[in-house]
Amino acid sequence: MKSDLAIVILAAGRGTRMRSSTPKVLHNIAGLPMVAHVLRGAQLLKPCKTIVVFRDVRVEQYIRNTFPDVLTVAQSDALYGTGFGVFSAIPWIRSESYGNTYPNTRHESHAEYELDACDLDTCNPASDRLNDQESLKGGRHIHTKSGDVTNNKPFPSRVLILYADVPLVPFQLLEELVRKPLKQAVGAIVTTHLDNPKGYGRVMRDNLGSIAKIIEDSNILPEQSINEVNTGVGIFDTEYLQDALNKLLKCHIAHSPNQDCVTNQDCVTNQDCVTNQDCVTNQDCVPAAHTEAHVLSPKVIVTEQIHKKAESEHQHAGQWMCRQDTVGAQNTKEEMRLTDIVEYFYNNGLRVNSITTSDSELLLGVNNRVQLAKTEKILNDQIIKRWQLYGVTIKSPETTWIDSTVQLSEDVLILPGCILSGRTRIEEGAVIGPFATISDSFIGKNTIVKRAEIIDARIEEGAVIGPFAFIRPGTVIGKDSKVGTFVEIKQSNIGPESKVPHLSYIGDANIGSHVNIGAGNIFANYDGKLKHETCIDDGVKTGAGNVFVAPVKVGRGAYTGAGSVIRDDIEEGALSLTELKQKTIPKWAENRGDG
């Protein structure tokens, strides 16, 4: 059965607090960008469609290259906020497009949208078609300048909303949210309780425990003590979500700082409305249908005194009053927040459920480098615990870092101070460390790697690496071979049971099996312009202090003497010496006067 779930991942935040030229959601934790962690979790839910809303083209490029089945949609630079981000995805939820081959449309302003053929007064709950249940049974139209992309075609009935900068949401929680029926509700959000909720949106409930609204931290009154916070994760009925976002966008446009205060002409027929002369700059219209602090936007503080006055002056639902935007200066970008729909639903008698979790540290977003480090530490602890339960011995979890992309086998031993990253794979019985750094490499069975750095290389079964060896990209170390202390190897093949024990540089070389490279050998592979290859055949024994000037070839079973400089090829089984006659001067030190 095809899934009825669509997933929208919001990745359009500017991330200014990261103080980085890299988009926030592309910052790595445990080997992957934050957005990749979110996408990996989302894909496990097997949705019929996944959409990422982006602003920076680098985010789009990464997703196109890494997750080709994910649709990417550009969020306009003209309007900000999570509400508009989700709104941007609605047409593509309803389209027949699957995967990012569908052309992205960057909407430059809200003027590009034709949001049903109705007036701005539809932001009044009294006239809202959410009250008309029959109107929600069929499809709705959303148009862009490029034409109708929906055409009343069937579309996913539920939308799960995730954030690209919240990478640690447990899959079990998402699974519960998706599988739990909405019943009589139009959606459900995930909440958690914090001892110090400062900086997070608070969940306000009515006397019956129903969620009434989400209040931004800056709008919390001193007497309000609320420690239940909104995590941002939520699931909504697609039709209700679309309808609410349509109306809220209209209100947002109508009440932006560049618009005049709502006049009588803007109000619903036969409804009272406060006129312009009663308004002040940057005022909005708000419904006065409830006695509690329910407004269209949780950006604005509405005191009990204002509502008591509203209750006395306006007794029937759908009437409007002007209010002063007491925090307008704090919201200079005029964001359209997704959280506004919670109050909007409540004002229309529609319920939003909640799932409350105690895993608060897994649901808080990353906004700066401090939170980035904290999040990576949490994820690293999870990764280490998982591998320990799988059968990997990790002697010092506190000093070990393992990327989420690393693969380990049973009975691997990891000693203190190790960093394993990228697409590294380590086979059974390997001993890693102490103080080894391995990235994007294969480490075979029963291999020993101690105090070494290995990058993009392959180490076959039984090899011994280190201490203090540096294995660079493109290197293959054969079975049961040895690379010893202070050896650097680059772009070379070392055959089975060969040894490079100490103090050597091997570059661009092919070394056969059962070869012994003497101490202090240098493969001079660079002529100032080009790199050249050195070939050492099976069974060769080289003396200490040799220099091989590439290109050069040494035949099978040949020997070289200590201190030799090999510039010409050596035939099989030969001995090659660079012989300089030794001259000894008797009593030289005495004659020099050294005493």
UniProtKB/Swiss-Prot annotation:
Keyword Cell wall biogenesis/degradation: yes
Region of interest: Linker: 370-390
Record GO terms (molecular function): glucosamine-1-phosphate N-acetyltransferase activity; magnesium ion binding; UDP-N-acetylglucosamine diphosphorylase activity
Annotated localization: Cytoplasm
Necessary cofactors: Mg(2+)
Binding-site list for acetyl-CoA: 519, 525-526, 562
Catalytic reaction annotation: alpha-D-glucosamine 1-phosphate + acetyl-CoA = N-acetyl-alpha-D-glucosamine 1-phosphate + CoA + H(+); N-acetyl-alpha-D-glucosamine 1-phosphate + UTP + H(+) = UDP-N-acetyl-alpha-D-glucosamine + diphosphate
Name the record gives this protein: Bifunctional protein GlmU
Organism encoding this protein: Tropheryma whipplei (strain Twist) (Whipple's bacillus)
Gene encoding the protein: glmU
